[in-house]
């Protein structure tokens, strides 16, 4: 509730079986095309929250993400602890850098969706994001999928992601996870078998 005045969300407050898929992208190691293939197969929209170097290193992937109907969101230029940033100018720089890179690659303005690195924030951060026109999205379901040399097994991933899913969940997955690349198609099928449907965060930002 304290987040709502700042246009910030952890989840959708609903009893409907809706899932909002999001991916945090720090760099590319070959999994994003697999993720996009699975999303396309299931006609599932997603938001990819990217840092600056992800755009500059992977312009073709950015174009594919957009052309397949997904949204590219802002995960800051350099992935700092944003709660330590107290000046609007420094805060704006972190977001504008990404937005400018995105526009240079796509020719379009970036959707103003923001996710703070590691979910760390201060109330003044949330106010600054709102003042800059951003909707801030945290998450209600995630698992430890980002450690490269300790990737969860398929069974571990399913156990965590299937048992903890809930109506209105904003799901955070990392694009760098080999496990996610391998299981996403099957995971989406399993959620569909549980009568969940995939929705875009655009719906939340417009309520």
Residue ranges of predicted features:
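Soluble non-cytosolic domains of exported or imported proteins
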Residues: 26-33, 56, 85-92, 119-120, ...
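His/Asp/Glu-enriched short active-site or ligand-binding loop at hydrolase and phosphoryl-transfer sites
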Residues: 120, 125-164, 196-207
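Catalytic grooves of carbohydrate-active enzymes
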Residues: 166-202
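Alpha-helical scaffolding segments of alpha/beta enzyme cores, especially the outer helices
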Residues: 34-37, 60-67, 93, 97-100, ...
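Active-site beta->alpha N-cap acidic-glycine motif
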Residues: 1-86, 96-103, 110-111, 203-206
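Divalent metal-coordination and catalytic microenvironments
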Residues: 24, 39, 72, 114-117, ...
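Histidine-centered catalytic micro-motifs
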Residues: 71-78, 119, 173-176
């Amino acid at each position: 509730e304290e987040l709502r005045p700042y246009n910030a969300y952890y989840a959708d407050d609903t009893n409907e079986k809706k899932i909002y898929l999001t991916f945090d992208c720090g760099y590319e190691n070959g999994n994003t095309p697999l993720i996009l293939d699975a999303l396309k197969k299931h006609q599932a929209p997603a938001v990819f929250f990217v840092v600056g170097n992800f755009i500059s290193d992977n312009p073709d992937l950015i174009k594919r993400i957009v052309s397949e109907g997904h949204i590219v969101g802002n995960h800051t230029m350099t992935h700092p602890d944003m709660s330590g940033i107290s000046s609007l100018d420094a805060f704006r720089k972190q977001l504008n850098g990404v937005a400018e890179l995105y526009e240079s690659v796509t020719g379009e303005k970036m959707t103003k969706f923001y996710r703070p690195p590691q979910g760390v924030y201060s109330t003044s951060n949330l106010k600054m994001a709102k003042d800059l026109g951003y909707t801030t999205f945290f998450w209600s379901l995630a698992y430890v999928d980002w450690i490269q040399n300790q990737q969860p097994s398929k069974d571990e991933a399913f156990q965590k992601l299937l048992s903890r899913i809930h109506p209105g969940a904003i799901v955070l997955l990392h694009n760098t996870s080999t496990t996610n690349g391998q299981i996403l198609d099957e995971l989406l099928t399993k959620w569909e078998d549980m009568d969940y449907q995939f929705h875009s965060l655009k719906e939340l930002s417009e309520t």
